[in-house]
Amino acid sequence: MARDEVRRILPADIKREVVVKDEKAETNPKWGFPPEKRPIEMHIQFGIINLDKPPGPTSHEVVAWVKRILNLNKAGHGGTLDPKVSGVLPVALERATRVVQALLPAGKEYVALMHLHGDVPEDKILAVMREFQGEIIQRPPLRSAVKRRLRTRKVYYIDVLEIEGRDVLFRVGVEAGTYIRSLIHHIGLALGVGAHMAELRRTRSGPFKEDETLVTLHDLVDYYHFWKEDGVEEYFRKAIQPMEKAVEHLPKVWIRDSAVAAVTHGADLAVPGVVKLHKGIKKGDLVAIMTLKDELVALGKAMMTTGEMLQKSKGIAVDVDKVFMPRDWYPKLWKEKE
């Protein structure tokens, strides 16, 4: 049976168009710190590492090691990997720690080795695995960190890479919170022979991939040493991505300089502050609020659609949830009440 070519597309791969509301708006170069111009100490404070987790330790242990290696106060990871699982583990640092929330809607990709408990013709394996694309129902495993309630999850694609006897190597793109071990168990049941997961590696977490940004713990130790002991920051800088990388896939609203400080001081984003935005924003969407220099200001929930933000002259456009930008990067440009 011929293997169909599978389109490997996650939600993070969706291309979005930008529409401009105010073409005359400009940004003052004296204010803010664009990602590419941040001093190394600031780059760390607002950074995220695309870490290659080794098999063995828990995700929590790996994050603790990163904190110790880099002498940090805070760090958090995006999407727990079981101890035996290796691969892409985004680790957000210091003031960027909460940005991992943005990775939830982005989708994840794994390469898995499934071992069947009986012989099955190749064409049947391919046909049955294809049936698992789309919405599936799962119950988290016994040792899961969440309550064991039935829930639906999306499988965006399954691409069989190799079949050798009872071993099936495949690549799978899934919604966050999908259990690959459970998926393999159900594929085995559907094939009538049973199956278990022999090996698993995460190859993507939204915008974070197995590419030149992926670093190991050994790399981190070396690069940190080069910077601290030898004054060479180039490698260490490349090992840390700006927090803006973690929101690449989100719908965005860009705001004028005069609105930035208000948002960093706790105000929701009002329509007059909007300069441009992505098409297709729906009410309730998680959106990233950006400056005109492409700095992340905050994450929030859209209170209007793209069309409403373009048409209206007042009202709340985004209900701000998490603010990342410090209050002193842009000046207060509103008048205090007497």
UniProtKB/Swiss-Prot annotation:
Q: Active site annotated at which positions?
A: D82
Which stretches are annotated as coiled coil?
Answer: none
Q: Where is the PUA domain?
A: 250-325
Keywords on this record? Isomerase, tRNA processing
Q: Which residues cross the membrane?
A: none
The record's section on InterPro entries has: Dyskerin-like, PsdUridine_synth_cat_dom_sf, PsdUridine_synth_N, PUA, PUA-like_sf, PUA_sf, tRNA_PsdUridine_synth_B_fam, TruB_arch
Concerning SMART domains, the annotation shows:
DKCLD, PUA
Which positions make up the signal peptide?
Answer: none
**What protein family does this chain belong to?**
Belongs to the pseudouridine synthase TruB family. Type 2 subfamily.
Q: What is this protein called?
A: Probable tRNA pseudouridine synthase B
Species per Swiss-Prot/TrEMBL record: Thermococcus kodakarensis (strain ATCC BAA-918 / JCM 12380 / KOD1) (Pyrococcus kodakaraensis (strain KOD1))
